[in-house]
Amino acid sequence: MPHFSLRRAQCAATLVLSLTAAGLAGASPASAAGATTPSMKVLTYNVFLMSKNLYPNWGQDHRAAEIPKTSFFRGNDVVVLEEAFDNSASDALKSAAAAAYPYQTPVVGRSRSGWDATGGSYSATTPEDGGVTVLSKWPVLRKEQYVYKDACGSDWWSNKGFAYVVLNVNGTKVHVIGTHAQSTDSGCAAGEAASMRSRQFKAIDAFLDAKNIPADEQVLVAGDMNVDSRSPEYASMLADADLVGADARTGHPYSFDTLQNSIALDRYPDDPREDLDHVLHRTGHARPARWTNEVVKEQCAPWTVSSWGTDSTYTNLSDHYPLRASAG
């Protein structure tokens, strides 16, 4: 979508600093994971592929080609991407990933085509899509898109929402939602962005409630939640979406690092470092005895872009770090 205000991103980690999430897991009891509960590896990554019409100098095509080659991108069961806004760059990334992840959803909000159902407040006249897509190693039995009704600031101009997929993992159903929640930007009034996020998380909860998913099936919610794991809003997010916090959070301490990530530093030099990306289980459903979210401190070979006669060089593929989640 056209981003008339800058939005925050999130990232996820390499093995660098270990951060045990003493308040992350919350008080929710661990569900007993049955012997047939698949062990899932999930990657969420805000790829910062903004529209080249609005942001022509951020190396979208180069980064879209390089991301599928990275080690963190390989070996997952499911990949959830956010900010896959630019049509040609996101299509190229998905095409390059198709050998490893042959089962893919369209990008949320880009059109109604390719979905089994469209819910929420989808509009064909909204200037930008929602930027979320799900890539899977496993066959997709059903895929639905849902566009949030509530938004503020620049998010008002996009069809942001979530993708819902049902996967067939060796004969067992696994349910995954991929989302990008309301960004905090200058176009929102004080406290408004958090209020919009709360409504969006409640919309996810209501959507899943209506599915009446059996308790012995895993339900995962992944994405750029725009909620810092260390903030009071984190507990509210868990309650609103009916999620269980990760048992551990390892790797780099921030998925959105405005000091060490070269793109985030350039774009948001005055913003705080935050830990915004998450892959979490829904309460009351099968899940592993222990679930870990790991932020990967990604770095890449330097790449350079030119704007108004000035060269800028970066050593990251997005302004967020990727986050991997798995049992253990």
Question: Model features per residue range: what roles?
Answer:
Residues P2-V16, G23-A99, G109-A117, A124-D129, ...:
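N-terminal, active-site-proximal structural segment of metallo-dependent hydrolase catalytic domains
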Residues A35-P38, F72-R74, A96-A99, A124-E128, ...:
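Extracellular/periplasmic catalytic domains that process cell-envelope and extracellular macromolecules
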Residues K41-V47, I67-L93, L135, V165, ...:
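Active-site beta-strand/loop signature of hydrolases that rely on acidic residues for catalysis
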Residues K52-L54, Q145-D155, A181-R197:
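Surface-exposed cleft-lining segments at the edges of enzyme active sites
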Residues R63-I67, A89-L93, G131, E144, ...:
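Stable alpha-helical elements in mature extracytoplasmic
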Residues A84-Q182:
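Structured beta-strand-rich core segments of catalytic domains in phosphoester-bond hydrolases
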Residues A181-D205, N226-L238:
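Active-site-proximal segments of metal-dependent phosphoesterases and phosphodiesterases across multiple
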Residues A210-L220, V227-G328:
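Metal-dependent phosphoester-hydrolase catalytic domains
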